[in-house]
């Protein structure tokens, strides 16, 4: 009798876990794309401003105050002379011009308090001597060295009164104010040596360069075209580094040409330690594949792969990587596309991290019609000028944002919304300044 054996059960492979996404993604259009503004707002909603720190007042210039700063006492705390001149009691001048002049003798060795009817020499910023309440300029002296007056002098003329700027407890600086040298001087005059501000965000740029095989191919073709020696530069990373430094943040750049996913993952994790934002750039083009950074992000934390209604830069990648949920944004390949995404998304992120409000929009009128894309926001390099007192834009070169020559001739990048009809002459467009 034949023996029938039960077939061995083959275990089905476990399905791969879905990549961890990020919550609250905005709605999309019929093509599954977000608008540029919605995507920007979404990214900014995922980050918080850098925690405030106490900074010495002179070093806080350009930073945003994180609390109201109150005067600890009257500012100024004492009454001082505003000008170099002579201090005296204004009451001794009340008869000047009724009908004749009044002469005030200058006391060369002033007593304390000053004798009524006399004046003493003072310097700007010095305390008013006891018994005086005004300061007169030296051009009122006659040939004998006495002060000659033909009209009474008002009390506190030429003086800066104690508490005349701020009284004790008054607000010197409001929360959110950007500190400039004038505000710094007020804080210092009030005796405040430290202020709570948001520090400049720490940004790490991870530049993924062409790998050795791609580099060798580039050099081979360059030699065939007569270029014996070409510098190994990354134009995308250079453009983004310069744009980031222009925003007055702390920038570190890390370059790599690794082809190893594990090495790149380790590099990104190290970049995130101590950073407030990681920006990934790449000049490595692999047709039909994700850029090298995007492919390693899902295991590192929540990742958002989005399609945005914009050209260039339709594919956008953002992640919050461990440890610490550090924001990381991946920029498209190429200086122009990367700059567009930087202006559209990275700059607002950095302002949010810095505790600053959104940047004011610069508008300029078109000098001629500009073509639109029917479904996507596009971007045009432009030059700016003032015509009749109004800002006017004109296309730089061929107006191709992917062309570095056009970018080099531009002052700004104009944002052209989608539409079936060209932008008419004279219509204002939002512009992002390049410098």
Where are these regions (language model features)?
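Short Gly/Thr/Asp-enriched flexible loops that form oxyanion-binding sites at enzyme active sites
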Residues: 280, 287-301
């Amino acid at each position: 009798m034949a023996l029938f054996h039960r077939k061995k059960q083959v275990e089905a492979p476990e399905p791969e876990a879905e990549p961890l996404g990020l919550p609250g993604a905005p709605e999309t259009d019929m093509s599954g794309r977000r608008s540029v503004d919605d995507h920007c707002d979404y990214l900014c909603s995922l980050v918080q401003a850098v925690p405030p720190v106490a900074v010495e007042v002179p070093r806080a210039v350009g930073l945003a105050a994180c609390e109201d700063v109150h005067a600890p006492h009257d500012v100024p705390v004492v009454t001082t002379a505003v000008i170099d001149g002579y201090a005296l009691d204004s009451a001794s001048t009340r008869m000047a011009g009724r009908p004749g002049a009044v002469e005030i003798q200058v006391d060369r060795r002033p007593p304390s308090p000053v004798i009524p009817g006399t004046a003493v020499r003072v310097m700007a910023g010095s305390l008013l001597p006891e018994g005086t309440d005004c300061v007169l300029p030296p051009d009122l002296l006659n040939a004998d060295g006495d002060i000659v007056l033909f009209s009474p002098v008002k009390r506190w003329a030429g003086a800066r009164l104690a508490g005349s700027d701020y009284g004790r407890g008054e607000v010197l600086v409001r929360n959110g104010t950007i500190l400039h040298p004038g505000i710094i001087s007020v804080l210092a005059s009030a005796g405040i040596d430290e202020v709570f501000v948001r520090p400049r965000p720490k940004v790490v740029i991870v530049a993924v360069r062409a790998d050795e095989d791609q580099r060798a191919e580039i050099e081979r073709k360059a030699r065939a075209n007569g270029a014996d020696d070409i510098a190994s530069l990354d134009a995308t990373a250079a453009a983004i580094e310069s744009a980031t430094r222009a925003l007055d943040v702390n920038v570190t750049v890390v370059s790599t040409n690794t082809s190893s996913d594990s090495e790149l993952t380790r590099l990104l994790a190290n970049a995130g330690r101590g950073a407030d934002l990681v920006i990934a750039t790449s000049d490595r083009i692999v047709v039909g594949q994700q850029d090298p950074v995007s492919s390693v992000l899902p295991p590192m934390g929540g990742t958002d792969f989005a399609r945005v209604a914009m050209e260039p830069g339709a594919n956008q990648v953002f992640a919050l990587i461990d440890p610490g949920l550090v924001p990381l944004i991946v920029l498209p390949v190429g200086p122009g596309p990367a700059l567009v995404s930087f202006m559209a998304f990275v700059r607002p992120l950095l302002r949010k991290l810095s505790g600053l409000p959104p940047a004011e929009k610069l508008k300029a009128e078109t000098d001629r019609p500009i073509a639109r894309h029917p479904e996507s926001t596009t971007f045009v390099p432009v030059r700016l000028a003032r015509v009749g007192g109004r800002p006017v834009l004109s296309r730089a070169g061929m107006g191709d944002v992917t062309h570095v020559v056009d970018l080099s001739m531009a002052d700004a990048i104009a944002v052209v919304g989608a539409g079936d009809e060209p932008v008419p002459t004279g219509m204002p467009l939002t512009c992002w300044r390049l410098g």
